[in-house]
Amino acid sequence: MMQESATETISNSSMNQNGMSTLSSQLDAGSRDGRSSGDTSSEVSTVELLHLQQQQALQAARQLLLQQQTSGLKSPKSSDKQRPLQVPVSVAMMTPQVITPQQMQQILQQQVLSPQQLQALLQQQQAVMLQQQQLQEFYKKQQEQLHLQLLQQQQQQQQQQQQQQQQQQQQQQQQQQQQQQQQQQQQQQQQHPGKQAKEQQQQQQQQQQLAAQQLVFQQQLLQMQQLQQQQHLLSLQRQGLISIPPGQAALPVQSLPQAGLSPAEIQQLWKEVTGVHSMEDNGIKHGGLDLTTNNSSSTTSSNTSKASPPITHHSIVNGQSSVLSARRDSSSHEETGASHTLYGHGVCKWPGCESICEDFGQFLKHLNNEHALDDRSTAQCRVQMQVVQQLEIQLSKERERLQAMMTHLHMRPSEPKPSPKPLNLVSSVTMSKNMLETSPQSLPQTPTTPTAPVTPITQGPSVITPASVPNVGAIRRRHSDKYNIPMSSEIAPNYEFYKNADVRPPFTYATLIRQAIMESSDRQLTLNEIYSWFTRTFAYFRRNAATWKNAVRHNLSLHKCFVRVENVKGAVWTVDEVEYQKRRSQKITGSPTLVKNIPTSLGYGAALNASLQAALAESSLPLLSNPGLINNASSGLLQAVHEDLNGSLDHIDSNGNSSPGCSPQPHIHSIHVKEEPVIAEDEDCPMSLVTTANHSPELEDDREIEEEPLSEDLE
């Protein structure tokens, strides 16, 4: 019996083993089929999956029972070698399908699976379900993305097609418009074949009308210029300065060409007018002056001017004047002399231009291109003419003022003379070689450029009248406050002038500092407040370099009349009026003289003559600084001034020995002269020139203190 039971158990175990292997293989095959079916078709419903799982479980159970029944037929010999095996793990992995509770009970009763294996089976089943859900979601997302991409591609294709259609339509429309325009042009040409020719004719007529208007305007300008020239020559003839023969008359008004001149010829005529003036004015050298406006003081220009004969003007022959020949002569004179009134120091002197030109040829090109005969140039000429007229009015006022001064000083006034008309639109006056050769007593003079015309002076009694122009420039000048003339009387009427014009005020730094302190409310100012008063009151100190501040500090520290006081605000400066008035009285009671460091061989007449020359040269009046122009009246004026200051005329000859003929001229260059500018009396003339002097030997150091900082004004 024991043997039989043993054989049954062995057979059962072997059968179980064989049955389980077959079951596991079937379950694996079923799981593969299920997975493949799940992978291929994700659309199978859960109900169908459960149904398949139940069928597979039933088949597995049936096969297991059949194997157990047939296992008893096998021999038990194999049980010696084989041990009873438990259910393989593959049974748990057979399928992730849902198992019913009945099937679970049957499996537990038959002891096919242990509880642990069942738990693992359930976990795997849940994991597979999650994977299936994720796969389904992933497939859905991919389908949606593909669908969106397809829609986008379709939309892009549609847009491209629409754009292409629009472009094609636009091209067709443009082609149609071009065709229509061509057809219209052809029709117009067929209908109006001469319309274009008419338009061209109208344009030509308009151009001709403009040219005719310009010609008329230019002729008017030439007429005005010639009238001024005739008036000037008549005034000179009345004064007896020149004698005009009948054959050498000015250009008559009728000599203007009425028509038939091109703009180039008109421009040449315009240039010729200035050349005619410069050539005619060479004849005025008999009166002792050279009023040529050509800035040519070089040797080459003097040779050419000396070689060129005077130009004579004849009447018109066949409607054309002899101005063309004069133009050729003057143009050749300008080219050989390589100089021009409107050209100096490499800069174009045309008003408002100041273009840099490297050489004279480039200047001529610039002049012909930029300053051709047009509306702008003619307007600038009109402005320059107005400037000259204003300067002439100013000159007449200054002449009247000087005559009144001479009458007050018991001197013989000069005869009033009409102011000459300007010979050129550019008021630059120089000394030429022709003038130097005709007057042997004259000295060589460097060319300068004042801003006002100068009246001619004859050999008889005349008046030296330098024109006072606001923009003369910064010149070293001293105020005549030594003669008890208050500074406020000078600044008050000319306050706006000094505030806006770039003119150096004719006062010492000490006088200006005192005025600034006296104008303050508490009669004391700090250094910065003094600086502010300088820049606020005078435009000169605003627009120039601030080197004058060193001079202000220098005067504050060295003059005894300025006292430095310490207070809560800091250091302030006040004025000691007693010391200031004492300083003024010392200068007034000193021994004044006009000349310092004059050689003993020179007399007082030569000294006064030289001092006048130096003062005039410093005042930018080169024509008047010629000793040949200083006559007996001018020497008498100097004698009277010297008498008022010093009280004696013992060293001066009453017959006017201070004339140029009596004074040794080679020693003039070694003379050092102090020059004192005058106080302005009205706003029209803010500054005028009176040569006064004050030099005290005992106050030499004090004078140098005042004069040293003023040298910075010339920078």
Swiss-Prot record:
Biased composition (Polar residues): 1-28
Region (Leucine-zipper): 388-409
Annotated Acidic residues bias: 699-715
Known tissue expression: Isoform 1 and isoform 6 are expressed in adult and fetal brain, caudate nucleus and lung.
Domain of life, per lineage: Eukaryota
Gene Ontology terms, MF aspect: DNA binding; DNA-binding transcription factor activity; DNA-binding transcription factor activity, RNA polymerase II-specific; DNA-binding transcription repressor activity, RNA polymerase II-specific; identical protein binding; protein homodimerization activity; RNA polymerase II cis-regulatory region sequence-specific DNA binding; sequence-specific DNA binding
Annotated gene: FOXP2
Protein known as: Forkhead box protein P2
